[in-house]
Amino acid sequence: MKKYVITSGGISEKIDNVRKITNSSSGKLGMTIANHLLESKSDITIYYVCSKNALRPSNKRVKIIEVVGTLDLKDKVESLLRNEKIDYFIHTMAVADYMVDYVTTLDKMKKSFLNNSDMEVIKDTKISSYENNLVLVLKPTPKIISLIKKESPLTYLVGFKLLDGVSKKELIEVATRLRDKNKCDLVVANDLEDIRNKEHKAYIIDKEDKVVEASDKEDIAKKLVRMMDNER
């Protein structure tokens, strides 16, 4: 039995117990890839790692693993790779690049600088709506894709790169660098301007720099699975 991990949907990062920073990823592409795998293969298990609101497949061969935030995603991905023999890892999830380090205000920052004192931060479970000039100080999140081959060198890794409003040449160059840096076996490159309604143009790039163009999510799923099968 082959085991797949598919990460899907968007990640939210907490500001306080009520508010979050998030993105608009629905998880539709991850679900489409999962459904195509389920239709084309019988002896598989899919670990579908997703956010609470992500679209998801419904099938007894799919194990749903919900995550809250990038650090939770990191813990659950590492646990999967350490405790299961994962044959394929398809990382479609839109992971946040930054998380909140602390929250303060401009006045508190000025006071800290003028007095050469520690920064006064807001630690309320719900920040008051009467606070003025809020400042969110962000810090980088861990890069999940860089963990995969370190934890499981033999796992077949598919990465995804999304840019906005760039040329095809630049898109493919950036995606290729992502592939090489993280030892991906395939990388899917797409531009936000090419994703609308039922259209979803993408370029699938293999380790030999062969580029296969896809026109929508179903086409991406079909061609991606075919390329994965041909290389294993």
Residue ranges: model-predicted function:
Residues 1-232:
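A cross-family phosphate/adenosyl-ligand binding-site feature
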